[in-house]
Amino acid sequence: MSGSSKQPHAKGKTLIIEDDCEAEALDEANPFSFKEFVKSQTFPGFVSSNSKRAFSKDSNQSTTQFRGPSECPDGNLEFQETYFRDPTLYDDLQEDEDDDWSGSYHPSVIENTHGPKVPSPAGTDGDESYGYGASDMSGDGLITGWQQAVLPSPPAGLHGKTQHRPDSTSDSEEGLRLLQINCEELQEENLHLKSKICKLKELNDSQNEKVRQLERKLEERILEEQKEAQDLESMVQQVEKNLQMMTKRAAKAEGNVTKLKQEMALLQIELTTYKAENEALRRGETAGMNAVKQNSNLALENLQKVVSGAQSSIKQLVAGAEALTLVAELLRSIDKIAEIHNDGVP
């Protein structure tokens, strides 16, 4: 199969878990270790350049891909182990065949993006090694896959450098089983984090909506307060105008009050003079009234006398009038007798 070839060393290397110190040293030297992956998340440009240089040095070498017993219990997940030779230790590995091969474990979420593994051909001395093929060793694609996967780091004892020995297949199976468990835990944690992210997004959306509503309410409140402030300002101006008018009216009223007080004083003086005059007139009227009464009594007596004289003269006139009427009737009767006499004589 393309992308797989036999290792250049005569003696096969086995994968075992090394000590922490040696693992840390090899991690620092290996550009494809888990620490380099963490560095790629922090300094992506630096790791990308290092990985490109490492791939350029190893371009004439090939890796062998194997499919190990890494099937998950549910039959749907497959854990793949990548294996790369350290380009910085290439000369030492050529001189000493017993030196350790460097490798790094990566989460299955990252490794699944690089394609399936193929079984190794016969003649590998019974060793099981896991790695990428030559066609999968493009530095840019590998670094991009690491940068796209943001996962928590596995336990310290599970991501160090490992080696295989011909008689330690049980150790490799135990390591693979631990890696499978770690992969399942990481996948569960990934799902849990995704659900948390969804909940946080929903919470963020609701909070953003609340913020927008509060902003709208705040704007409306500010507009209302501005309108109320304008109304209050207009009311204050109107009140100030009213106060000015009231002060003017009060000043006018005070002037009128002073004038009225002066007039009241004058009127009181006049009233006192009028009262004195009335008292004097009353005193003078009493004396005049007595004289008027006497004169009126005399006039009444004279009038009674005149009336009695007038009544007697009236009686005389009535008697003369009756006599005159009697004379007139006699004259009329004489005229009638004369006419009758004249008519009776031939």
UniProtKB/Swiss-Prot annotation:
Q: Which GO terms describe its cellular component?
A: centrosome; ciliary basal body; early endosome; midbody; recycling endosome
Answer yes or no on keyword Cell membrane.
Answer: no
Q: Where is this region: Disordered?
A: 46-77, 93-129, 153-173
Q: State whether keyword Nucleus applies.
A: no
Which stretches does UniProt call biased (Polar residues)?
A: 46-67
Give the UniProt subcellular location, in the record's own words: Cytoplasm; Early endosome; Endosome; Recycling endosome
Which keywords does this chain's UniProt record carry?
Cell cycle, Cell division, Cell projection, Cilium biogenesis/degradation, Coiled coil, Cytoplasm, Cytoskeleton, Endosome
Q: What is its main location?
A: cytoplasm
Ranges in a coiled coil: 170-317
Q: Where are the transmembrane segments?
A: none
Protein's GO biological process? cell division; cell projection organization; positive regulation of cilium assembly; positive regulation of protein localization to cilium
Function of the protein: Endosome-associated protein that plays a role in membrane receptor sorting, cytokinesis and ciliogenesis.
Query: Which family does the record assign?
Result: Belongs to the ENTR1 family.
What is the designated name of this protein? Endosome-associated-trafficking regulator 1
Species annotation: Xenopus tropicalis (Western clawed frog)
Q: Per UniProt, what is the name of the gene that codes for the protein in this document?
A: entr1
